[in-house]
């Protein structure tokens, strides 16, 4: 699968600007991001790139007085472990109970759940607010013996943690070939079983389930579009956790969820990002 590598320069270059830029680029089809001095490096499948879409998204950038410029070239088809080392991917501890690190890390903190991740083209290492929010939800949930779906699984970090916490069986689905390959590698690294990984979008859910727990950490538009398909593979009492959007998006997410019979339980937030929990 061929990718373009984009280098975005932002002024001012702040954490907020970079977070919003990553979200905006996600709406334009970009799927992988690396923070760099002065902005972001981002990746998109060549077959999905649309110049007009990108220009429109940047023209409507929601942070006032932000200047954004970019260049791009064809990306090498390679393993991204070395790139993450260069970009200071450090071990992260979430909730004092879960540590996420890679094979190249030394002096890793001890925690109840130790997860190994070797990222390739899938960026789900626990560092982003949305991933850490869902991890926090999983740490606070009773998962033993529950069937679980990780939709838009990325590195499958969430499915791996859920399996470690007793969820069984687990299903992990992602539209991206790299994510599927990386998920399989990460599952093997962690020595967990009963996680079935497959490639596809929400249409791949037809005939699957019902699941006791569904996780979808993607983005606002995909969640709004695909929520009815998540509900179709749930049963009364199933839990749905969603993230990948901002606090301001919660009302739209709630309206769509309630149209499909879901009941809002609570939300969590971190640096303007949100995660929500619903029950069917």
From Swiss-Prot:
Gene Ontology molecular functions: protein-lysine N-methyltransferase activity
Annotated SUPFAM superfamilies: S-adenosyl-L-methionine-dependent methyltransferases (SSF53335)
Catalysed reactions, semicolon-separated: L-lysyl-[protein] + 3 S-adenosyl-L-methionine = N(6),N(6),N(6)-trimethyl-L-lysyl-[protein] + 3 S-adenosyl-L-homocysteine + 3 H(+)
Keywords, comma-separated and alphabetical: Cytoplasm, Methyltransferase, S-adenosyl-L-methionine, Transferase
Binding site for S-adenosyl-L-methionine: 131, 152, 174, 217
Family annotation (InterPro entries): Ribosomal_L11_MeTrfase_PrmA (IPR050078), Ribosomal_PrmA_MeTrfase (IPR004498), SAM-dependent_MTases_sf (IPR029063)
Record-linked CDD domains: AdoMet_MTases (cd02440)
Localization, UniProt: Cytoplasm
UniProt GO cellular component terms: cytoplasm
The enzyme's E.C. designation: 2.1.1.-
Principal location: cytoplasm
Function: Methylates ribosomal protein L11.
HAMAP family membership: Methyltr_PrmA (MF_00735)
Family: Belongs to the methyltransferase superfamily. PrmA family.
Protein name per the record: Ribosomal protein L11 methyltransferase
Native organism: Bacteroides fragilis (strain ATCC 25285 / DSM 2151 / CCUG 4856 / JCM 11019 / LMG 10263 / NCTC 9343 / Onslow / VPI 2553 / EN-2)
Lineage, broadest ranks: Bacteria, Pseudomonadati, Bacteroidota, Bacteroidia, Bacteroidales
């Amino acid at each position: 699968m061929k990718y373009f590598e984009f280098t975005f320069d932002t002024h001012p270059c702040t954490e907020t600007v970079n977070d919003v830029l990553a979200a905006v680029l996600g709406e334009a089809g970009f799927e992988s991001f690396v923070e760099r001095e002065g902005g972001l490096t981002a990746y998109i499948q060549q077959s999905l790139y649309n110049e007009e879409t990108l220009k429109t998204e940047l023209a409507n950038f929601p942070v006032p007085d932000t200047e954004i410029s970019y260049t791009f070239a064809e990306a090498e088809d390679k393993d991204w472990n070395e790139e993450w080392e260069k970009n200071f991917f450090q071990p992260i501890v979430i909730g004092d109970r879960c540590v996420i690190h890679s094979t190249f890390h030394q002096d890793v903190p001890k925690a109840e759940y130790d997860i190994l991740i070797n990222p390739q083209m899938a960026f789900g290492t626990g560092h982003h607010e949305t991933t850490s929010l869902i991890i926090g939800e999983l740490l606070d949930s009773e998962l033993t013996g529950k069937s679980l779906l990780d939709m838009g699984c990325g590195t499958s970090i969430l499915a791996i943690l859920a399996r470690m916490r007793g969820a069984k069986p687990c299903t992990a689905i992602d539209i991206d070939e790299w994510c599927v390959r990386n998920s399989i590698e990460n599952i093997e690294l962690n020595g967990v079983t009963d996680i079935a990984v497959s490639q596809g979008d929400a249409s791949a859910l037809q005939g699957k389930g019902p699941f006791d727990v569904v996780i979808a950490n993607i983005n606002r538009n995909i969640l709004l579009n695909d929520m009815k398909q998540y509900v179709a593979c749930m049963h009364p009492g199933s839990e749905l956790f969603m993230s990948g959007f901002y606090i301001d998006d919660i009302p739209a997410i709630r309206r769509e969820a309630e149209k499909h019979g879901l009941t809002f339980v609570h939300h969590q937030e971190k640096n303007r990002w949100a995660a929500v929990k619903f029950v069917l």
